[in-house]
């Protein structure tokens, strides 16, 4: 449910009553609102409609000393210039590469991706739009369908919980720690160029800074470094071949917990 200010100049709304009614009849509805409507919203705006998050993404925001869990929603239209349908406008349809880039810079930065698809004047989705969505689904399954970490060498039960593909299990750093590492050993040297990491958020977003490292020539080599992780973080880096890989939690606000740590080899990524 959007509390969108577009076109509202000069109008006065009883937001408290609107939200009270919504919670009465649809209590599980997610309310989207900008930070100006801080007390009403469950999700916040990314800041524009480009389809990407270009900043460190923390789910908790602070207004006047009051903290609230408000994940970011990344809204962008399937067609480049508008949200509503226009005839003879197929040329504005975003390319598959543009959509993949948007996915990886929204979902892959811990956001909720809202891709706007408008019905035509017959109340149906245009065939070209539907075809592009099928292409996108196929491409995502191809890119992220072969998790190389699933074929890891035997490890301890704690580490295995971040490698099992089960979102209901997680690896935990030592209780009360503010730094830790999760190491994966593969059966043989393996080439990869993407990592996908998911943080366990039931007890809050904890990871503040991390690196992903590969063991090469007798030492750890950092492939990528980042700030917060959150629900899902997709990192891309030049292809590397290694048998040992680690997620290194450099700093965390509290005990870090990781739902999933996955590696992928994506051909022609970024081209």
How does the language model describe each region?
Residues 175-179, 201-271:
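Trp- and acidic/polar-enriched beta-sheet ligand-binding modules for extracellular glycan
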Residues 2-164, 169-178, 183-191, 196-198, ...:
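Mature catalytic domains of secreted/periplasmic carbohydrate-active enzymes
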